[in-house]
Structures are given as structure tokens and as C-alpha cells.
A protein has these predicted regions:
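Small/polar loops that bind or transfer phosphate-bearing groups
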Residues: 21, 228-229
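C-terminal catalytic lobe of FAD-dependent flavoproteins
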Residues: 66-72, 79-80, 91-225, 232-236, ...
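Flavin-dependent oxidoreductases
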Residues: 4-86, 90-101, 110, 119, ...
Length: 244
């Protein structure tokens, strides 16, 4: 059986399967292994999160005309009752640049107002940016798509690269597809006791006073409020991280 090997700080790690799901860095890992090179450009998207008093401006996601850069600025209600507006789409050179910009956030508001003219920038409670892993083809006519396959000539090396919109929606199906690729290469027994559901995360905003007191007694981190607007505590954030 083919085994990949990497040496880090004098230690050698081996694995029969390597899944390259490194986001904007997936091209760098792929190009260490494969003769046929790929290139990924980070495409930054900026969002505004509006206050809950804007949440009833729409009752479904409103998209605009898509372009070659993506689906454009959308306006969507969140499950928590806020309004989310964005994202922009800007190709940038820095794979770690997740800063928001005055120009980008102004664009979010201006273009979002084409869909919902009642948007008020003063109701923005926070803003953030993320990077899409945009796979660039040498032939401009070739349509960009997810790269999900075992690399030719390198058994056991599986690329899961260029996962941009609608990558989040596709994630469960991508996971099952990659699992099938792995199973075809390296037969493994399925865990009989695998737990396929995640325990819910406590919510201080929705809890009763008695429930809040109990959570704080159990873990004082629930008394440390990180976001006053939404009443999100350190305990909830840590609970979410540990449930990944």
C-alpha cells in the first residue's frame, strides 16, 4: 500500500491517505506532490450583520444577478433573527487577509439597497470578511469548479480544492463523496457506535434565570459575555468549538 510521508521538526509522519482540504493553501500542498500544477487565488468576501430589528425586512434570501465573480450581494434573514448582507468578491494576493475595508462595506450596503431599500448602515452590529478558495484555470474559457479527486499518479492523495460557493451547501455531500473515494482506496470498517448527531449548544439568551445560574455554576465561562448585542458568552463559544 502506498504511504505518504512528511518530516516535520525531525519527526516522520506516515499515512496511507492524505486529504488535501487546505482551502486557499490547497494549491501549495498539491504542487508539492503533483506534476500538473494548480493555482488558487483568495477571493475576499465582506459582510454586514444587521441588528435584529432589521430581521423582518425580508422573509427569504434575496439574490441579485450573478456574475463571473459569484452570486453577488444577497440579503438574508438569519436563524437568530438578524439580517445578513453580503458578500463582496475581490481577488487579493494575501492568503491571510481577512480584514474588512471601508470600500467593501460601503459596496455591501449600496448594492444590498438595490434589493431592500430600507437597509440602514447604522443598524450594522458587526462586520467580517472571509476568503473563498478560487481555483484559477490557465484557459479562461474553462469553467471553475470543485476539484475533488484522487491525484493522477499519486495513489492515496485526494484533492478537495477550490471549494467556493456553493461549498457550504455542498459540504455534507462532498464529505460523503470523499469518504467513498477513501473507501475505494483503503477499505475500512465503519464504526458501529458512530454518533451522527451533535449535542446542542446552550444559549444564555434563551435560557431561564435558573438555567443561566446552573450553567454558570457548572462553568464560570458562561458568565463572561463576549457579545452584548446577542448575549453570547465565552462558554457558548467554547462549547461550539469543542463540538466540531
Amino acid at each position: 500500500l502506498f504511504r505518504s510521508q512528511v518530516q516535520v521538526d525531525g519527526e516522520i509522519f506516515e499515512a496511507p491517505i492524505v486529504i488535501n482540504a487546505a482551502g486557499v493553501y490547497a494549491d501549495e500542498i498539491h504542487n508539492m506532490i503533483c506534476e500538473e500544477k494548480i493555482r488558487i487565488v483568495p477571493r475576499r468576501g465582506e459582510y454586514r450583520l444587521m441588528d435584529k430589528n432589521c430581521g423582518d425586512l425580508v422573509n427569504s434570501t434575496i439574490f441579485q444577478q450573478p456574475s463571473k465573480m459569484g452570486k453577488g450581494i444577497l440579503v438574508t434573514p438569519t436563524v437568530h433573527g438578524n439580517l445578513l448582507v453580503g458578500p463582496t468578491a475581490e481577488d487579493i494576493p494575501d492568503k491571510q487577509d481577512v480584514d474588512t475595508t471601508a470600500e467593501g462595506l460601503a459596496k455591501v450596503l449600496n448594492l444590498g439597497s438595490n434589493s431592500v431599500d430600507a437597509l440602514d448602515g447604522r443598524q450594522t452590529i458587526t462586520s467580517f470578511a472571509g476568503l473563498r478558495a478560487h481555483l484559477v484555470h490557465e484557459d479562461p474559457a474553462e469553467k471553475s469548479d470543485f476539484l475533488i479527486e484522487e491525484a493522477a499518479g499519486h495513489p492515496g492523495f485526494i484533492d478537495v480544492a477550490g471549494i467556493e460557493s456553493p461549498g457550504l451547501t455542498s459540504a455534507p455531500a462532498i464529505g460523503e463523496y470523499v469518504a467513498q473515494i477513501v473507501e475505494n482506496i483503503y477499505p475500512a470498517e465503519r464504526k458501529a457506535d458512530f454518533v451522527d448527531t451533535r449535542k446542542g449548544i446552550p444559549s444564555m439568551a434563551l435560557a431561564t434565570e435558573e438555567e443561566r445560574e446552573a450553567l454558570i455554576r457548572e462553568n464560570p465561562a458562561f458568565a463572561n459575555v463576549i457579545c452584548r448585542c446577542e448575549l453570547v458568552t465565552e462558554g457558548e463559544i467554547l462549547s461550539a468549538i469543542h463540538r466540531l
